């Protein structure tokens, strides 16, 4: 019962991670955020690997999944620091999320709750193929939305890491006990004896 509850809980957290990652991937595509798009894709693959390892009792896959979650927590912590401009990070100077290929910002910058977008015409700050806009009235600014999204990812990843370690430990213990009992013992297996068909012939002796 304990093993089933642990596996079921891990699968549930993996499904939540998958839904959250797909939702985030959609909004990152809309905002042309190439670095998060790549990271989200790798995360989706790792979560699918974790689900497969849980269902198929593959402890190695769960270990790989848990190792990825450590990197995932670090990435999301960096995103929080980036959008909140911790230390020397600056959104106006660093365009890490787009690999410095464009000036696009988060999709939530213009489409956040209550945001009113006003184009600024004939602005000297406008670059070629770009336009300047003014965003006002947002109930929650986009840096905080991105930070909350990353915080949710960290929360799910921490719980997923704990349950992945627990379930993989259970799987490894079961494998060890199976070996100890003799699951792979050659002496526990006896080959079926081949039956031979012999024809009896009468024996004649000379008197």
Swiss-Prot record:
It is a multi-pass membrane protein. The chain crosses the membrane at residues 2-22, 35-55, 62-82, 147-167. Detected in the brain only and specifically in neurons. Expressed in multiple regions such as cerebral cortex, thalamus, hippocampus, olfactory bulb and brainstem as well as in cerebellum with high expression in granular cell layer. Interacts with ATP1B1 C-terminus. GO terms for cellular component: plasma membrane. InterPro entries: Na/K-Atpase_Interacting (IPR008516). One of its GO terms (molecular function) is ATPase binding. Keywords: Cell membrane, Glycoprotein, Membrane, Transmembrane, Transmembrane helix. It is found in: Cell membrane. Its main location: membrane. This is Sodium/potassium-transporting ATPase subunit beta-1-interacting protein 1. Pfam families: NKAIN. Belongs to the NKAIN family. It comes from Mus musculus (Mouse). Glycans are attached at residue 100.
